Amino acid sequence: MNDLLPEQSPAWQQVEAVIRRVAASYGYSEIRMPVLESTQLFKRSIGEVTDIVEKEMYTFDDRNGESVTLRPEGTASCVRAGNQHGLLYNQIQRLWYMGPMFRYERPQKGRYRQFHQFGIETFGLESADADAEVILLSARLWREFGLADQVELQLNSLGSNEARANYRDALKAYLSDYESELDDDSKRRLESNPLRILDSKDEKTQKILEGAPSLSEYWDAESKEHFEQLTARLEAAGISYTLNERLVRGLDYYNRTVFEWVTTALGAQGTVCAGGRYDGLVEQLGGKATPAVGFAMGMERLVLLLQEQGKLTPRRVVDAYLMPLGEEAELNAPRIAEQLRNELPELRLVSHCGGGSMKKQMKKADKSGAQVALIIGADEIAQQLVTVKPLRTAEEQQTLGWQALIEFLQPLTRG
């Protein structure tokens, strides 16, 4: 688990603001779900033999003996909320969410046991147009963040559920001949979830997989047509991609389209965004059959990538520091501060509290990171003036009337 400290928050706020703006530009609405859900929700959706359910979920019994889990991902919760509140049946919904998720896994660079995800979920649209839309939305985010040259889109199709099952059987039959040579995790997965072996990082297992059947050989005609329509739309929109037939995703609910955005900018190749189509999940969780497609983006890795590429320029926490010198100034400081906030709502103004000498207050003003100190004493109060002292430049201090002060401070609100 990790804290986000005050000096880190502005970078996150900058990232969140871009995400909110881009999601809104595609007509998506925010949904907020609880972080605590019934354990059965994730067992039914993610799959009981996945690593997440078997090893990584934070699960416990509440006081009523009900098994509950801190959400490890957002899609299942979003579907549950949509079913529960009647948002999905016979409707088109474009939803987004952002918030903390929890997985008990080994902490590493950009990965924590409490982490944050931004997710997009589209319901009620079966055509490849919807798949293209969510991928285009994610691509726009990379462009907005200035990271388009740091990420690569990898794309695959799992075909229909029947095609996936047929491929699963063929892959299992092939790998059974090499069972003794597989790594321990792959041996365990051979019976329960052989598709996950395609994700193995073991070099010997990867060598064995080179001769494995190809997933595309098992695509049904409709899935093949759907995938061709998707790639045609991406190509028409100028989105380049790499076909990766070993891309299967770690959650059981996917069918047809799956995709990942990967980067090598954080060291070894890592995934920073992943998603796909999950047409059966809504019905699986108690709703009516509803097509759906979406993605999730890991925000810790996104922020880290932006920082390492020098792409974050968060706004200052403080623009101006108001220094009242003397009792009369201290009495009037709250009134003056509120008037400034009324005139300049975007101004980040700290008003000194607790009195003290000019030297002491100036030290605190400098430490705050403010661009200017606003000094008021008895003379300034009497004449309705404010003395402005720049703290980050060699400019001379000046004493200004109210309107001149507002005009002076206005540019700071854009910094």
UniProtKB/Swiss-Prot annotation:
A molecular-function term among this protein's GO annotations: ATP binding
EC number from the UniProt entry: 6.1.1.21
Transmembrane feature ranges: none
Record's GO cellular component terms: cytoplasm
InterPro entries referenced in this protein's UniProt entry, alphabetically: aa-tRNA-synth_II, aa-tRNA-synth_II/BPL/LPL, Anticodon-bd, Anticodon-bd_dom_sf, His-tRNA-ligase, HisRS-like_core, HisRS/HisZ, HisRS_anticodon
Residue ranges the record marks as coiled coil: none
Reactions that this protein is recorded to catalyse: tRNA(His) + L-histidine + ATP = L-histidyl-tRNA(His) + AMP + diphosphate + H(+)
Keyword ATP-binding: yes
Main enzyme class: ligase
Superkingdom assignment: Bacteria
Cellular compartment(s): Cytoplasm
CDD domains referenced in this protein's UniProt entry, alphabetically: HisRS-like_core, HisRS_anticodon
GO biological process: histidyl-tRNA aminoacylation
PROSITE patterns, A to Z: AA_TRNA_LIGASE_II
UniProt keyword terms in alphabetical order: Aminoacyl-tRNA synthetase, ATP-binding, Cytoplasm, Ligase, Nucleotide-binding, Protein biosynthesis
UniProt family annotation: Belongs to the class-II aminoacyl-tRNA synthetase family.
Subunit structure: Homodimer.
The protein's name in its UniProt record: Histidine--tRNA ligase
Organism, as annotated: Idiomarina loihiensis (strain ATCC BAA-735 / DSM 15497 / L2-TR)
Gene name for this UniProt entry: hisS
